[in-house]
Design a protein with these regions (language model features):
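Short, locally clustered residues in the helix-turn-helix/winged-helix DNA-binding domain
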Residues: 59-62, 75
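C-terminal regulatory/oligomerization modules of transcriptional regulators
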Residues: 2-32, 38, 137-171
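Basic amphipathic alpha-helical segments that dock to polyanions
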Residues: 86-96
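A short acidic, leucine-rich amphipathic alpha-helix
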Residues: 69-75, 86
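Pre-recognition alpha-helix immediately N-terminal to the DNA-recognition helix
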Residues: 52-57
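Non-DNA-binding regulatory cores of transcription-related proteins
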Residues: 95-171
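Short capping segments at the starts of secondary-structure elements
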Residues: 47, 61-66
Length: 171
């Protein structure tokens, strides 16, 4: 669920931007864009017009977008758009922690908490496609502890939960 105004903690440099400190609402697209611009500037990487537009298209959706859906959208604006254009933009956005790849859907969703990109859970509604990101630190710590007990070092945690969102359950 998107919110036009969301109570988030944003430092001036946007390094700790996260809409999930106390809320489960996604920030609006303009907030996500400001966060992405600040993150890229802080990391001295170029947030090119194509990368920005791909990020914007992903941020406008509550559900994930597949690469070829992105290509169709971008092609309507830029006739020169080709699959490598989209995949390069997606690789960049993933590398910067600005989007997540939803493995089960082979789709992409905006990440409102790039500082927490190492560990997160995605709740995916199987009816309407809504994707909500949460951060349950207890789950992450238990998994790290269990893995360490087996001599395994977790580099990234991404848990996908499939079910029905509140809207679809009420319908």
């Amino acid at each position: 669920m998107r919110a036009s105004a969301v109570d988030v903690t944003i430092r001036a440099d946007f390094q700790t931007f996260c809409a999930f400190d106390d809320e489960t609402l996604m920030p609006d697209v303009s907030s996500l864009l400001r966060m992405a611009e600040a993150r890229c500037e802080d990391r001295c990487v170029r947030f090119t017009p194509i990368r920005r537009r791909v990020f914007e298209m992903i941020s406008e959706r509550e559900s994930g977008l597949r690469a070829y859906e992105l290509l169709d959208l971008l092609s309507s604006e830029r006739a020169s758009a080709r699959p490598p254009t989209i995949y390069r933009a997606l690789d960049f956005l993933l590398e910067q922690g600005l989007v997540h790849r939803i493995e089960s859907l082979n789709a992409y969703v905006a990440c409102p908490c790039p500082d927490h990109a190492r560990g997160f859970q995605l709740m995916i509604c199987r009816h309407c496609g809504l994707v909500e990101e949460i951060h349950d630190h207890d789950i992450m710590q238990r998994l790290e502890s269990t893995a360490a007990g087996h001599g395994f070092a977790i580099e990234r945690q991404a848990i996908e939960l499939s079910g029905l969102c509140q809207r679809c359950r009420a319908a």
